[in-house]
Amino acid sequence: MDVKQYLTEWSECYRKDFVENIMPFWMEHGLDRKHGGVYTCLDRDGTLMDTTKSVWFQGRFGFIAAYAYNNIEQNPEWLVASKSCIDFIEAHCFDTDGHMFFEVMEDGTPLRKRRYVFSEGFAAIAMSEYSIASGDKTYAQKALDLFNRIMYMLNTPGFLAPKYLDTMKSQGHSITMILVNTAARIRAAIDAPVLTEQIDRSIKALRENFMSCE
């Protein structure tokens, strides 16, 4: 089997699984049609095990549904699901300081807040992808505004609680990597110098700090 045939067969396999298994499962069992957004703790049979909602997953599913609409199949239900997650995020998942919660109750009541900005990153790419899918450019601007907010939080001493004390300086791989993806996905919807600049900075940091010369 040549490489092209190999990739084609696996691509078709993944597409079939996504369209016929993964999305139907989450649309039927995960989508919260009362409060909005999506439940995140489901058993294999779809049984709801916990009604609390991970905020980062609201953005992730909002992105996945919109990306699937843009690249796999223009299923209107997927677009509605994406918008539901974004609406839930905007209505319930931002604290008064602009930093997002990490976990909320099913109705959006705040439950837990952490020092990360991963919730913001997923929310931003959901908004940018939904902008492309729906044609509503206001969501592209919202994504860019949120990205700028992420950068403010990361670069403002004391805004986010540090993981370690200043005893030893360190740099995390996760945020360096995630900023590349976040900026790239937003850039697909709206171009801004700050996005390309961050991608370049992250790639430079990855090469200098996280890659072995081997």
Model-based region annotation:
Residues M1-E214:
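Glycan-recognition and catalytic cores of secretory/periplasmic carbohydrate-active enzymes
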